[in-house]
Amino acid sequence: MNPRIENLLQISADTSEDIRQQVPDMDAGFDDSDRKWEIIVKTAGSLDRIRSIYTNAEFTQLLCGYWIVRTTIDSIEALATEPEIIFIEKPKALYFELYAAKSEACVNVAKAEETQYGGVTGKGVLVAVIDSGIDIENGEFLDDSGKTRIKTLWDQTTGITYSDKEINSILEDYRNGAVKTLPARDVTGHGNEVAVIACGRSGVASDADIIIVKLGNSGGNAYIRTTQIMKGVDYCIRKAIEYSQPVAVNISYGGTYGNHEGSSIFEMFIDDCCSTYRCSICIGVGNEGEGRTHYSGQLVSGNVLDEELAIGDYEPQISIQIWKRAMDNARIELIAPTGERLVISERNAGVVHHNIKNMRIVSGIWTGTILYG
């Protein structure tokens, strides 16, 4: 395996399509229509030379030396050998991280304290919400004269951007009945609720100017890709620089892939953007409830750790990630309710296919055994 290519990308490319499509983190970024992968690239220096060589690839430049590239797997392997390339990783699937009403977010308490003590209201600051859209006619996002507080809006689903003047013109036509539909409509309600909490007139930053990015489609999938978030962050910061205003960017999405230690290109991009301009990037965490999708423990050399995994009926697939330090050795064994065993060790690391009841996920209690040392 090429050390400059993320192992999940290499594993996903080597996995059969019917299996890969069952795992969102493996399938994210692959376009079946042209057999190309969308990848995130961290670079050192200019890519002018590389772009002149890989003419069939599509390059999108982001801030801080990051690029999003669409190309074939063969070109990815060749690209990884170029001296300008530091690392390549694939997009991951992200999901909503906020399902709370304004009262549950303690906004009412914050507003009461703001009134009592004369707290900050966000005046002169931009609040950017990267989410599922916005209802631009909502009074929460209008000023006292009925004009929009949104300075710019980018709808990734259509590729169209709107200025505040264009939004006000659309609103006037909508009120007069000249138009029946509004751009960037939030059909899920998630983005609207997030924006109300963050920068609505009854929200926290009630006097802030607003930037909205409606995230694009993911080929009919129920998730958003990290690359869509990265493009949104890039857009918001560039606009803040153009307006000469500080910006607070809200991202109420999250995922379960990775070690969550800040070592992925996506996480490093967020960190680097924070030091590029006067900006703060806020990302939601938690929201797992009783899902209990994460677990951590400590292993002692020579000991065996047994953990149970409860898998419900009709689960089409299950993705298990075990993260450890590179210098530690561990032998991992999965025991199905049927008694079948799958042993994973350093010797057979990589892509391993194992049939259990003709590839069906067996519901019940699975046992994960880890031998350390």
Predicted regions and their residues:
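A general sequence property marking short-to-moderate contiguous segments
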Residues: 1-18, 281-301
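Autoinhibitory N-terminal propeptides
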Residues: 1-67, 74-116, 126, 139, ...
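Conserved short loop/turn motifs at secondary-structure junctions
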Residues: 63-70, 253-259
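Stable alpha-helical elements in mature extracytoplasmic
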Residues: 75, 190, 194, 229-232, ...
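Structured segments of extracytoplasmic/periplasmic soluble domains
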Residues: 82, 156, 197-200, 232-235, ...
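Subtilisin-like serine protease catalytic core
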Residues: 115-227, 244, 248, 278, ...
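Substrate-binding/access-modulating region of protease and related hydrolase catalytic domains
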Residues: 217-299, 314-342, 349-373
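Non-catalytic, beta-strand-enriched accessory regions in extracellular/secretory proteins
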Residues: 299-312
